[in-house]
Amino acid sequence: MTVNIAILGFGTVGTGLPTLISENKEKLSKILDEEIVISKVLMRDEKAIEKARAQGYQYDFVLTLEEILADSEISIVVELMGRIEPAKTYITKVIKAGKNVVTANKDLLAVHGTELRALAEKHHVALYYEAAVAGGIPILRTLANSFSSDKITHLLGILNGTSNFMMTKMSEEAWTYDQSLAKAQELGYAESDPTNDVDGIDASYKLAILSEFAFGMTLSPDQISKSGLRTIQKTDVEIAQQFGYVLKLTGEINEVESGIFAEVSPTFLPKSHPLASVNGVMNAVFIESDGIGDSMFYGAGAGQKPTATSVLADIVRIVKREKDGTIGKSFNEYARPTSLANPHDIVNKYYFSVETPDSTGQLLRLVELFTSEDVSFEQVLQQKGDGHRAVVVIISHQINRVQLLAIQDKLKEEVDFKLLNYFKVLGD
């Protein structure tokens, strides 16, 4: 008996999947009592087919999706093309043809996931996407299964390997933003246009998917607050270390009584926090829940083999569900109405770096500005000025989002003060 699959896209992960199937052939056969066979591979043009054959791949390469749709033996289609189009159009056609889908396309799922999941349910087929979040970490299935009896209250993750690589270089080797980005591009971690990585967009897509599994609520990327790495200076990293923190780009979801709040932002993590030691291109997700307490899931966030492993796990799960007659069930069965938290209910400590005139009385003026919004200080550091301008660094006590925005507005109105940076600070 065989399970016939088709692959759309034959890039890094697409070429890694056949190798993984071959390496695990005996184990897969024992688990499924069937052999997984790659029946067709969709390629973009004849030149790509020639290149693949020259590399030793001898699959049935095709140039149109229709050739896959017309093959009644193919039950699972694996989309590994990336980007929203033509992936969305292709997946829609595959689902309507009654075939199951596995994808690693986080962009597509974050933007059009609700629509595609509804379509899959209507046509009684599977739509699985474990590899879309944190590559080789089986976090989605863990949330869907192992946390089904628990209430998650807080999720915090390092979800983008490129930005984490850059922050590691900035923290451990005192590199600048530009130096760390150039190295990430040289190593192939960052694209020539790094916007999605450095501005928190990629992480926000993953956070949108995680919100469904962890909290049962669907968030669009537009409902997730985003800030990235571009404004981070060496002095910010140095001050974080001086105060006992590590600066990381994190994705966070908090649930409070009024709803959930999701944010991607540079964050001061206490050096004792489990995520503070997650370095390089690695990813991790830290979860606080009522039953289990604190738990963390760590692993490769990308790469050929880790991502292909998650893709293959989805294929195995689909075959099992076909055998037990539950193939139409959603990947994530936890859903409730989305409720966004009241900004007054979202509280954190914050780091502020403010440039002021280097003259008597300016620190007092700055203190008065903050206290006018009922914001008090946990730590204050006035850096040595040049006789003209100085920098004051503040870590506040807990404040809510409304107070944070008010402080930003007041600093913008003050011609003598310039807000250089502000970052969330975690820890008691």
UniProtKB/Swiss-Prot annotation:
A sodium ion is seen in the structure; a metal ion may subtly affect the relative position of the nucleotide-binding region to influence enzyme activity, and could increase the stability of the enzyme. InterPro entries: ACT_dom, Asp/hSer_DH_NAD-bd, HDH, HDH_cat, HDH_CS, NAD(P)-bd_dom_sf. NAD(+) binds at residues 13, 303. Disulfide bonds: none annotated. L-homoserine binds at residues 191, 202. One of its GO terms (biological process) is threonine biosynthetic process. Its EC number is 1.1.1.3. Na(+) binds at residues 130, 133, 135, 137. NCBIfam families: PRK06349.1. This is Homoserine dehydrogenase.
